[in-house]
Amino acid sequence: MSQEIIKVKNFSVRMGRKKVLDKVNIDFKKGESVVIAGRNGSGKSTFLRCLADVILPDQGQIDFYNGITKEKIGFISDQLSLFEGYTVQQGIDFHSSVFAIKDFDYTLVDELKLDKNQKIKSLSMGQRTLFQLSLLLSQRPEILLVDEIIHSIDPYLREKFLEAVIDLMGDSQTTVIMVNHTFSEIEKIPERVLVMEKGRFILDERAENLGGKIKKIESDSKVSGEIPCILKKETEFHKEYFIYPFSKELEKKFPYEYKTLNLNDMIKAFVGGQYVKERNN
């Protein structure tokens, strides 16, 4: 069994009067790849920033095991500064001096054909993202946090980014936690899928099990209230119900047509649907 590397206990964050995270309890294991989905404002990016120690809690704590220090946690976000006035090489030199990196890995920089004398502020969003990743990989992180950024970069650089992340997971057993709302391009990454709503995780499943545990019913009328419906989309003439957890016993008792969804369709539903039932951690 994989070693527990992060434990979040009774974690709450308020911003003004709004409770953004509400008594979150969850843990992550070494080498695990996790994707967090949820609607805008659900708390997923705040949660990632808490793991990165960018935001402090009003209640609760996060414990890191296996001797992990801040230097071994990499955080990628489009809101982070990247030494705007520096050239690419100056940024590398500064980062290397701060983290005592003796042998910087130029693989990604060279693959991108970046001019090392080019100002960082003149790089495209995709180039900046890959450059930031190259800086973090040079730290040999044990935890990599990626905050909803890859959907904004072009397909070629997105593929480069994902290849680098997959290599990192395989070579170093790095724990990767990504926040994302588009899953079509990253279905090969997550082992575990979390869905957050109103500051709490309402779904936590292995990606390989999701297809068997979540089904969809399409109907012209409402389904039985005994069916465990986690979200629904309803119009006057058409209704869609997302059933979780699904079981063969449920199918026998309520013989509707239960449709299987792929991971991308599931996440689209969670991001855009109207929740009718919330699940505690």
Briefly describe each language-model feature range.
Residues 231-281:
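C-terminal coupling/interaction segments
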Residues 37-39:
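The feature captures the beta-strand-to-loop junction immediately N-terminal to the Walker
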Residues 144-148:
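Catalytic Walker B motif of ABC-type/P-loop ATPase nucleotide-binding domains
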Residues 52:
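Helix-to-loop junction immediately C-terminal to a conserved catalytic motif
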